[in-house]
């Protein structure tokens, strides 16, 4: 008779322990219920990028002196700089400048080491296309400034999500 009583007591203790574990899990679930969602509805909502975000490169043709520092510091020798030496003034004249964003790793070395600051990083990150050849930007495409998501009234911007207090 005693083994049956002890088994019944063990069964009761296990039931109480299981109920406690289920209750703890349920309390964790309830604590997450009052938080705001982490995900955003992407095409209609966009996060504002940080100041140091490395997006598409903007190029100012008039400032470039064709020194090719950007090509030398690029880990994959990506920027294509075509220039011609003007013999009468003994200066380089820039003919063409292009970057293929299908290959670019967005390291920012070209922007950092440019002596004339003709390169800068923008907040644009939507570079997807159906044809990879469209990602090869020449100096005209690189010179276009991206449309700011702050100016687009169809997109709801999310600046900072409220932080969770622990």
From Swiss-Prot:
Record keywords, A-Z: 4Fe-4S, Chloroplast, Iron, Iron-sulfur, Membrane, Metal-binding, NAD, NADP, Plastid, Plastoquinone, Quinone, Repeat, Thylakoid, Translocase
EC number(s) on file: 7.1.1.-
Binding site for [4Fe-4S] cluster 2: 74, 104, 107, 110
Topology of the protein relative to the lipid bilayer: Peripheral membrane protein
Binding site for [4Fe-4S] cluster 1: 64, 67, 70, 114
Gene Ontology BP annotations: photosynthesis, light reaction
GO terms under cellular component: chloroplast thylakoid membrane
Main localization, broad class: plastid
Cofactor field: [4Fe-4S] cluster
Localization terms from the record: Plastid, Chloroplast thylakoid membrane
GO MF entries: 4 iron, 4 sulfur cluster binding; iron ion binding; NADH dehydrogenase (ubiquinone) activity; quinone binding
Cofactor-binding details, from the entry: Binds 2 [4Fe-4S] clusters per subunit.
4Fe-4S ferredoxin-type domain sequence ranges: 55-84, 95-124
Reactions mediated catalytically: a plastoquinone + NADH + (n+1) H(+)(in) = a plastoquinol + NAD(+) + n H(+)(out); a plastoquinone + NADPH + (n+1) H(+)(in) = a plastoquinol + NADP(+) + n H(+)(out)
Gene3D superfamilies associated with the record: 3.30.70.3270
Source organism, top-level taxon: Eukaryota
Physiological role: NDH shuttles electrons from NAD(P)H:plastoquinone, via FMN and iron-sulfur (Fe-S) centers, to quinones in the photosynthetic chain and possibly in a chloroplast respiratory chain. The immediate electron acceptor for the enzyme in this species is believed to be plastoquinone. Couples the redox reaction to proton translocation, and thus conserves the redox energy in a proton gradient.
Quaternary structure annotation from Swiss-Prot or TrEMBL: NDH is composed of at least 16 different subunits, 5 of which are encoded in the nucleus.
Family per record: Belongs to the complex I 23 kDa subunit family.
Protein name listed in UniProt: NAD(P)H-quinone oxidoreductase subunit I, chloroplastic
Organism: Chaetymenia peduncularis (Daisy)
